[in-house]
Amino acid sequence: MFNKNFLIENAKTLFYALIIAIFIRSIIIQPFYIPSSSMEPNLLVGDRLFVSKYSFGYSKHSFPFSPPIFKGRIFFNEPKRGDVVVFKTPADNRTDYIKRLIGLPGDKIQFINSELYINNNIIFRNKASNNDKIFCGNKRVDVFSFKERLPNGSEYKAVYFKNGSFQNSDIFTVPEDNYFFLGDNRDCSKDSRFLSSVGYVHKDNLVG
């Protein structure tokens, strides 16, 4: 026999479960999937990770579909240089990118002969390996691996193509309330070096 109360109770349960799931994903933690090789060797294609949503406070991008429920960012905590951060790319304010934070507001970032400079100071690095291979798209390429250390002591491994030309760039001056991000797979990453597609990332675009 058709039980109307049973359907109502199940609908309520599903509704409450949906509200709880949205709350957890918006306020506490959210799963993300790594779709590209731009963060290799530290994050691999297909890796799944959970991202803290409260680390840097909250903006509209903390919530599904980025609803304009308030402006700016609340409970803001400044991210640290070297943090791996998920953000909405400024090009469309929809696509999630995950990169390493290199430049803080006011910093000057530059590449000279594939060596990273922050505020005119070369970033210390040790060569970790001459014989690594890494993916760029669906191709496997030979790379040099380096252990880089940022001014605040944050360390990570970064890789550069062996047969790539030296990277030389203009100086990127990070605007107020913005950040500069790089992929660890330096020759296979679309990041803040590409001003038309990513560029500087405003603090309101940080997800976690």
List the predicted regions and their residue ranges.
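Soluble "head" domains of membrane/secretory-pathway proteins
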Residues: 2-8, 23, 27, 32, ...
